[in-house]
UniProtKB/Swiss-Prot annotation:
Gene Ontology CC: cytoplasm
Binding, ATP: A26, M27, S28, G29, G30, V31, D32, S33, L52, G144
S-S pairs: C120-C217
Source taxonomy: Bacteria, Pseudomonadati, Pseudomonadota, Alphaproteobacteria, Rhodobacterales
Site residues, Interaction with tRNA: H145, Q359
Identification of the protein by name: tRNA-specific 2-thiouridylase MnmA
Length: 380
């Protein structure tokens, strides 16, 4: 008797009907996650929407371009009511403050330029929320991120989004293989954000024309300095602006007001050569400035590496990959030399300016859209 053919997989990769496949959708209240939830509900999946209350407890009701607070929660609930699936709001404010906001402030005090969105994905959404999804007996968790999950010979692989302008791989490099096995990203293959909004119109969602979220969600109007001053008043302590020889050039009103690579607003005039911020020394309360040439570097120390390759990270003396050292910059060719399973020296083929501790260094394949993980840039 011939063997039965392999069972047909549904669109989420499970060998059972959508109605028997439970998927928790992480809903921020924006158009992306709303479309994911509506799309899966339309396909007949057993959808459960979950929104995290991360901050403000409603104080941001009227804030535009935020997520996970105030009106966004109501928007997510309206989508669930329209599409007919349950929706839950979980209070994660304390977890979010401890895991993301406090570290954001501490990192800045330490002279780094942190990326809190990565820590939020790593420590809140893809950790605690993912465990909540499992507690709800979900088969998987779906999000509205623009990134792709593809099946490879050794398991699920992380790939850049089809729309390079919307690609969020820089913010998701720390996704572990175990998390990736459970996650789904239904929007990653779409050619453009216009396609997402067209789907929102198709499903009749009220968020179809809602603006995209901007900046850091817990920072009003992009004024991160005010948030840090509130959390850590010592960040506003005045100090000296000095050159690389320690010569005092001016005074400043808190290192929190400066970033690596900054030129304007230093209060230094009359010099033949323009000066840029090249280092922040929060402990000494010093802003160190120097010529633009000192912003360039080819060697980047990276730690806390999350490796997503098929071979062990230390199986080679060097990996020839492309890396991103800022979310807004394209990948550049580099040689990655492992020091341990979680630490490496990255040698850039071409020097980059303004590389700052606290930023991520994300690894990409040079011949495909695959992401090989990444790590955090540390002080040399």
């Amino acid at each position: 008797m011939p063997l039965d053919p392999s069972p047909t997989l549904n669109s989420l990769g499970f060998a059972k009907p959508p109605a028997e496949t439970r998927v928790v959708v992480a809903m921020s209240g924006g158009v992306d996650s709303s479309v994911v939830a509506a799309m899966l509900a339309e396909e007949g999946y057993d959808v459960v929407g979950v929104t995290l209350q991360l901050y403000d407890h409603g104080a941001a009701l009227a804030k535009k371009g935020a997520c996970c607070a105030g009106l966004d929660i109501h928007d997510a609930r309206r989508v669930s009511e329209k599409m007919g699936f349950p929706h839950y709001v979980l209070d994660y404010e304390n977890i979010f403050k401890d895991a993301v906001i406090d570290e954001f402030a501490e990192s800045y005090l330490g002279g780094a330029t942190p990326v809190p969105c990565i820590r939020c994905n790593e420590r809140v959404k893809f950790k605690d929320l993912l465990e909540t999804a499992k507690d709800l007996d979900a088969d998987c968790m779906a999000t509205g991120h623009y990134i792709q999950r593809k099946s490879g010979p050794y398991g699920a692989e992380l790939h850049s989004a089809a729309d390079a302008n919307r690609d969020q791989s820089y913010f998701l490099f720390s996704t572990t293989p175990e998390q990736l096995a459970f996650l789904r990203f239904p929007l990653g293959h779409l050619p453009s954000k216009e396609d997402t909004r067209a789907l929102a119109e198709k499903y009749g969602l009220s968020v179809a024309n809602k603006p995209d979220s901007q900046d850091i969600c817990f920072v009003p109007d992009g004024d991160y300095a005010s948030v840090i001053r509130k959390l850590r008043p010592e960040a506003a302590a005045p100090g000296d602006i000095v050159d690389t020889d320690g010569r005092v050039l001016a005074r400043h009103d808190g290192v929190v007001n400066y970033t690596i690579g900054q030129r304007r607003g230093l209060g230094i005039g009359g010099l033949a050569t323009p000066l840029y911020v090249i280092k922040l020394d929060a402990e000494a309360r010093q802003v160190v400035v120097g010529p633009k040439s000192m912003l360039s570097t080819r060697t980047v120390p990276v730690r806390e590496i999350n490796w997503l390759g098929d071979e062990p990270f230390q199986s080679r003396d060097a990996w020839h990959l492309a890396v991103k050292v800022r979310s807004t910059r394209p990948p550049t060719d580099a040689i990655i030399r492992p020091i341990s399973d979680t630490e490496a020296t990255v040698e850039l083929t071409s020097p980059e300016e303004g590389i700052s501790p606290g930023q991520a260094c994300v690894f990409y394949d040079t011949d495909s859209s695959r992401i090989y993980g990444g790590g955090w840039i540390h002080k040399g």
